[in-house]
Design a protein with these regions (language model features):
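Conserved N-terminal alpha-helix of the aminotransferase class I/II PLP-enzyme fold
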Residues: 55-97
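Active-site PLP attachment segment
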Residues: 219-258, 264-275
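Conserved beta-loop-alpha segment that forms the PLP phosphate-binding cup at the N-terminus of a helix
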Residues: 90-116, 129
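Structural signature of PLP-dependent enzymes
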Residues: 279-302
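N-terminal "arm"/small-domain region of PLP-dependent enzymes with the aminotransferase-like
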Residues: 1-73, 404
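Conserved C-terminal alpha-helix-loop-beta "cap" of PLP-dependent enzymes
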Residues: 303-416, 423-437
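PLP-dependent aminotransferase-like
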Residues: 114-174
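Active-site phosphate-binding strand-loop segment of PLP-dependent enzymes
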Residues: 148-209
């Protein structure tokens, strides 16, 4: 889709693939094609597990549903809507995860023997793409924050030096952001790459929300990057393994499609494609409001965690104008070593003892991934009331309750209060545990949703 089409602002209320599947479902077509479960009839256990609605639209490519390898109707329309929503010249629906998106991006830019400038902390999919195409990496080694033990972004002078020393490189690749939410100066790096006649590629596996959030770091397309791989399933709400590849006006979409078709399946999942279609519509219509709330939730959690002491939930205070040019405020990263626990230990405690599954834990940090799905009863924003402790059973809590140390929540905002939780709180109080978090320091009352 060309630039003028992008500016027309298509009707983002549409979801062409979803609409086509709904029409197809109503046609009651008799299946003598694949998949062999025949709309679930051939595998009742699978149907019972996933549901008839799901297996009923797990179908093969056909004329009314278009073909992912050569889209001409509803898939093409869905890609045009995605490009419009993300401010790209063209968008490709990807069903092999962002790994396939990243690899297609690199294979488009690089041939055997070409050099590509990239940070050392790239995802393995980038390096696997270099193995496939025979391109040569030129590494930029980002600095490491000594206290937190995390890699930062690429400094402008590091990228400038790499471009100067490798003038024949064909592209510069940037993480936008890193796993921990660290962003490089993307606009400056794009300009340096373009001034040197190179493409700028962005791995935005963790940056879908940048396209829909005021106050968040700049997105790759807004910064002028040539290609970006976007994990819609991470923070955008689509199904796992669904992704987007976005390109700018300087990259030929026909060639990109050829590259994608070298490795992507010829049996594109309509479950994944429809999830991309529906999720794009949701983001286009409601994403800005939702991600503003997500950022507010993360900031509230940072303040509460840092008030406990011992833990350090880091944020925009890390920004230094260069190696940490910006920070993704939706990321809730917490440094744990100061309380004598490795991040992986806190990860295990949260999962095994509290049934809380966070994204990961490393040697010194944990990461809780907040996204479009983290709006538990609007707990941070809804009206609240204070009730005596024992009268809160069955209510939704609107504040933290924790013993310190270790400072791990017994109750968190948005969590329903059970009898067992109340028993535990009273037991901990009776044993003299230091209780923190609630507005009432004696925890005789709790704030709940009104």
């Amino acid at each position: 889709m060309n630039e003028s089409r992008t500016r027309t602002k298509l009707d983002q209320r549409r979801a062409p693939i979803y609409e086509a599947l709904e029409q197809f479902r109503q046609m009651r077509v008799v299946p003598f094609d694949v998949p062999g479960h025949k709309r679930g009839r051939g595998n009742p256990e699978l149907t019972a597990f996933l549901g008839q609605q799901c297996v009923g639209v797990d179908v093969n490519s056909m004329k009314p549903l278009d073909n992912l390898c050569h889209p001409v109707s509803v898939i093409r329309e869905a890609e045009e809507l995605a490009a419009d929503a993300f401010g790209a010249a063209h968008a490709f629906l990807m069903v092999g995860g962002t790994t396939s998106s990243v690899q297609s991006m690199v294979l488009t830019a690089c041939k055997r023997g070409d050099e590509i400038i990239l940070p050392r902390n790239v995802h393995r999919s980038v390096l696997n793409a270099l193995v496939l195409c025979g391109a040569v990496p030129v590494y930029v080694n980002p600095e490491v924050d000594k206290r937190l033990g995390i890699s930062l972004g690429m400094k402008r002078e590091q990228v400038e030096k790499a471009i100067r020393e490798h003038p024949n490189a064909v592209a510069v690749l940037v993480n936008n952001p890193t796993y921990y939410g660290i962003c490089s100066d993307l606009r400056a790096i794009v300009k340096m790459a373009h001034d040197a006649g190179m493409l700028c590629l962005a791995d935005e596996a963790h940056g879908t929300h940048f396209y829909f959030g005021g106050g968040l770091p700049v997105s790759a397309m807004a910064a002028g990057a040539d290609m970006a791989s976007v994990s819609m399933h991470k923070s955008g709400g689509s199904l796992t393994q669904s992704s987007l590849l976005l390109i700018g006006p300087n990259v030929h979409p026909g060639y990109v499609r050829q590259i994608i078709n070298l490795t992507q399946t010829t049996s594109g999942s309509y479950l994944l494609m429809s999830s991309l279609d529906i999720s794009r519509r949701n983001l286009a219509l409601r994403g800005r409001q939702v991600f503003h709330q997500v950022a507010d939730m993360a900031e509230y959690a940072r303040e509460e965690i840092n008030a406990v002491g011992g833990y350090y939930a880091f944020g925009k205070e890390l920004c230094n104008g260069n190696s940490v040019f910006d920070f993704d405020t939706t990321k809730l990263s917490v440094h744990t070593l100061d309380i004598g626990l490795a991040g992986i230990e806190v990860y295990d405690i949260l999962r095994d003892e509290y049934d809380i599954q966070i994204e990961f834990g490393d040697i010194g940090n944990i990461l809780a991934y907040l996204s479009i799905g983290d709006r538990p009863q609007e707990a941070f924003y809804a009206p609240k009331k204070s009730l005596p402790l024992r009268e809160t059973e069955g209510m939704v809590c609107s504040e933290f309750v924790m013993c310190y140390p270790p400072g791990i929540p017994i109750l968190a905002p948005g969590e329903r209060i059970t009898k067992e939780i109340l028993n535990y709180i009273e037991y901990a109080k009776a044993k003299g545990c230091s209780m923190t978090g609630p507005e009432d320091p004696d925890i005789l009352h709790l704030n709940v949703l009104a």
